[in-house]
């Protein structure tokens, strides 16, 4: 169990999870606001 925790906390695994979630977030934003240069929820 300790080896699995050590493996999951290594940089390539964390980077894969981070970039995967970031890509998913960007895909979902582009699905709801296609071709948006300015996003409505960022305008103040």
UniProtKB/Swiss-Prot annotation:
It is a single-pass membrane protein. Keywords: Chloroplast, Membrane, Photosynthesis, Photosystem I, Plastid, Thylakoid, Transmembrane, Transmembrane helix. One of its GO terms (biological process) is photosynthesis. It is found in: Plastid, Chloroplast thylakoid membrane. InterPro entries: PSI_PsaJ, PSI_PsaJ_sf. May help in the organization of the PsaE and PsaF subunits. Belongs to the PsaJ family. HAMAP family: PSI_PsaJ (MF_00522). PANTHER family: PHOTOSYSTEM I REACTION CENTER SUBUNIT IX, PTHR36082. This is Photosystem I reaction center subunit IX. The gene is psaJ.
């Amino acid at each position: 169990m300790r080896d699995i925790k050590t493996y999951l906390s290594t940089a390539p695994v964390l980077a894969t999870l981070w970039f995967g979630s970031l890509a998913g977030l960007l895909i979902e934003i582009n699905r709801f606001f296609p071709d948006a240069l300015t996003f409505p929820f960022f305008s103040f």
